Amino acid sequence: MKKEELRLIFMGTADFAVPALRALVENGYQVKAVVTMPDKPMGRGHKVSPSMVKLYAQELGLPILQPDNLNEESFLDELRTYQPHLQIVVAFRMLPRSVWQMPPMGTINLHGSLLPMYRGAAPINHAIRHGDTETGVTTFRLRHEIDTGEVLLQEKLPIGHEETFGELYERMATLGASVLVHTVDLFLEGEPVSIPQEQLPGYVDARPAPKIFKDDCRIDWDKPAEEVHNFIRSISPAPTAWTKLHRPRMESIVLKIYRTQVIEREPRHRGRFGSIIWDKKNLDVMTRKGVIRILSLQMPGKKQMDAASFLNGFALSSDMYIE
């Protein structure tokens, strides 16, 4: 089959999916329609906004479907009118069987980990949180159980020791787009070979990657410095690690922490975890084992700033601590 004969449906919402959609179109594939979530209120003003995928699909002039319910018969009927050979899912939502079984070639998914490791909604975050030095992307055949389908292609990617979620996210989206195009290329040649995840290395010890909520983002300083550092960078810039600065006889302040550095892995300073060590330029916090240097943070109602700017405008005292 030729590229121009292969009818594709693309399903995605988050900006992670945009490079994949762009790559398919730029490589000559015929995306007949794009399925994305309905517009919803976003940001402080709760302004109703479209997804990034919808905005890009509008630029391309592609038909856009935004069903509230993926099981609605009207949506299924409209999807059938495009007679897709293959459906592609990137950063979307769980599909009912009636949708993913529709095309004769099936439905494939792009996932931000080396499956079977980190099945779930937040694979990039969890790879950083666990201190992994390598991750990657996987394309696989969709089936009902989340992220369990047979693997088509995988490609590895190193993780920098100081790399944040936001930085790795962008690199993963770019790599994922390339791997996805190569995967679709395989379908032009016939039925691609796929491997059950049970046969892949690490299947028995695979970690899950559940969605991360705001309540999960509070920093626990009663952990080794390396773990605290990995936790903070795993959710920077969003949903963002936070902690409380306690001030005697005053209300505590919530601080968002964006970037840190481990300056002591073995404790040389004495003191309780959460104790603050500072001078004119540096803001350090003791952990259970070692010391973390805060490089970038944010106070309520203020913009993100470096530690020196914070110290210049905020008077710390020896009876304050972080928790």
UniProtKB/Swiss-Prot annotation:
EC id: 2.1.2.9
CDD domains given in the database record: FMT_core_Met-tRNA-FMT_N, Met_tRNA_FMT_C
Residues given in the record as (6S)-5,6,7,8-tetrahydrofolate binding sites: 113-116
Xref: Pfam families: Formyl_trans_C, Formyl_trans_N
InterPro entries: Fmt (IPR005794), Formyl_trans_C (IPR005793), Formyl_transf_N (IPR002376), Formyl_transf_N_sf (IPR036477), Formyl_transferase-like_C_sf (IPR011034), Met-tRNA-FMT_C (IPR044135), Met-tRNA-FMT_N (IPR041711)
Substrates-to-products reaction catalysed: L-methionyl-tRNA(fMet) + (6R)-10-formyltetrahydrofolate = N-formyl-L-methionyl-tRNA(fMet) + (6S)-5,6,7,8-tetrahydrofolate + H(+)
Keyword field contains Coiled coil: no
One GO location term (cellular component): cytosol
GO MF: methionyl-tRNA formyltransferase activity
Entry keywords, A to Z: Protein biosynthesis, Transferase
Superkingdom field: Bacteria
Family assignment from sequence similarity: Belongs to the Fmt family.
Described function: Attaches a formyl group to the free amino group of methionyl-tRNA(fMet). The formyl group appears to play a dual role in the initiator identity of N-formylmethionyl-tRNA by promoting its recognition by IF2 and preventing the misappropriation of this tRNA by the elongation apparatus.
Name this polypeptide is given: Methionyl-tRNA formyltransferase
Source species of the chain: Porphyromonas gingivalis (strain ATCC BAA-308 / W83)
Lineage: Bacteria, Pseudomonadati, Bacteroidota, Bacteroidia, Bacteroidales
